[in-house]
């Protein structure tokens, strides 16, 4: 799932750190593909309240991804899109399965916006509300 789709599940949380935590796994992966961060395996490092709520969001991200990526909806739509992409990407280094995966997620983000299921300003307001000293 992509950023707005993750936000959808926690759009009503009063804690901005949780919202940041729900998108942080994908943000880090986008920043550097070689980073393989697993804070959920080091819970003792997250005793401080701000860090703990960030970790709550991170764990929520993992739970939602596990459910979504194992759903028949996601897998069926990904396969449909992949079939359409295979001939287009035949000479490309981009794997059709990768692009289909991201494509389905971005389409879901688009649909959430189009059907006004999320408030984009609220998403960015939450990110802006995260206090730097909560994260150290």
Regions found by a protein language model. Give the residues of each.
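An N-terminal structural lobe/cap that precedes and organizes the functional/catalytic core
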Residues: 1-98
């Amino acid at each position: 799932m992509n950023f707005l789709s993750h936000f959808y599940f926690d759009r009503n949380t009063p804690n901005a750190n949780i919202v940041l935590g729900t998108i942080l796994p994908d943000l880090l992966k986008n920043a550097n593909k070689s980073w393989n961060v697993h804070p959920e395996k080091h819970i003792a490092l997250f005793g401080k309240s701000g860090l703990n709520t960030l970790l709550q969001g991170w764990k929520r991200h993992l739970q939602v991804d596990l459910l979504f990526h194992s759903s028949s909806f996601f897998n069926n739509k990904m396969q449909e899109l992949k079939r359409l992409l295979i001939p287009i990407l035949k000479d490309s280094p981009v794997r059709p399965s990768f692009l289909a995966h991201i494509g389905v997620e971005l389409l879901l983000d688009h649909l959430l916006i189009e059907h006004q299921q999320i408030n984009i300003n609220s998403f960015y307001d939450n990110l802006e509300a995260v206090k730097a000293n909560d994260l150290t």
